[in-house]
Curated annotation (Swiss-Prot):
Principal localisation: cytoplasm
Keyword match RNA-binding: yes
Alphabetical keyword list: Cytoplasm, Ribonucleoprotein, RNA-binding, Signal recognition particle
Protein's UniProt name: Signal recognition particle 19 kDa protein
Record carries keyword Ribonucleoprotein: yes
Subunit structure: Part of the signal recognition particle protein translocation system, which is composed of SRP and FtsY. Archaeal SRP consists of a 7S RNA molecule of 300 nucleotides and two protein subunits: SRP54 and SRP19.
PANTHER family to which the protein is assigned, alphabetical: SIGNAL RECOGNITION PARTICLE 19 KD PROTEIN, SIGNAL RECOGNITION PARTICLE 19 KDA PROTEIN
Lineage of origin: Archaea, Methanobacteriati, Methanobacteriota, Methanomada group, Methanopyri
Organism: Methanopyrus kandleri (strain AV19 / DSM 6324 / JCM 9639 / NBRC 100938)
Similarity comment: Belongs to the SRP19 family.
InterPro entries on file: Signal_recog_particle_SRP19, SRP19-like_sf, SRP19_arc-type
Gene (UniProt): srp19
Biological processes annotated in GO: SRP-dependent cotranslational protein targeting to membrane, signal sequence recognition
């Protein structure tokens, strides 16, 4: 397994993106951050990375990270460039993810 890249998050120019943010099976209190209409079942880190690359967000994959609300679930996370607010960035990714799943 590849080593997790070290990414500095102290500045306001990067955003953490967890697959849980896009999971249709989760409620808002369980970590979903996008509207149900844009959420998908079982979002994968590889899908999110591919979409973030297409959007020019310079994604960094960290596979060994665990979403704090579900620490037993080792799906990893992405670190992406902040080009808009976190909410707008997540909505952009969610729209592309939904399109990709429906095609």
């Amino acid at each position: 397994m590849a080593e997790t890249p070290t990414v500095k998050l102290k500045g306001k120019d990067r955003i953490v993106v967890w697959p849980a943010y896009f999971d249709a099976d989760r409620s808002r209190s369980e970590g979903r951050k996008v509207p149900k209409r844009l959420a998908v079942r079982n979002p994968r880190l590889t899908e999110l990375r591919h979409i973030a690359e297409k959007l020019g967000l310079n994604p960094k994959v960290q596979r060994d990270k665990r979403y704090p609300k579900r620490w037993w679930d080792d799906k990893g996370r992405l670190i992406v460039d902040k080009v808009e607010s976190k909410r707008k960035t997540l909505l952009m990714i969610a729209e592309k993810l939904k399109e990709r799943r429906e095609s």
